[in-house]
């Protein structure tokens, strides 16, 4: 395959880490696909609990050069959901309930913004999933949107199985 346009470097690391007295799997990944246009590198840290009931994530936008736009930079982080997942946004627009077709319930929650980007919002938008035969199927996606400063930003989130 080929990396997306503008991506020159991708870093990836996977390891087992302690988490609440148990082992968890942590993945650190980064790419420079936004460096030439926005002057930012995107890093994502994922930590999956040993029992698979929590996925904690952190998206970090790090200044990579003096290139890129001045002022605040709009961003959108997208989480494409599987077929048949029903989404109900919370009243504060910082969380969502995800009802799976088999009846299991997951919660999604935004954490704090430690990068000074200001208000970040969560919404649900239409999306598509293409099956193995090339047929598209309507799905939904969760979208985190906000403005990052040129100095970067740090945004945490959590998926948790609740039922």
Features from the language model and the residues they span:
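CBM-like, beta-strand-rich accessory domains located in the C-terminal region of large
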Residues: 1-163
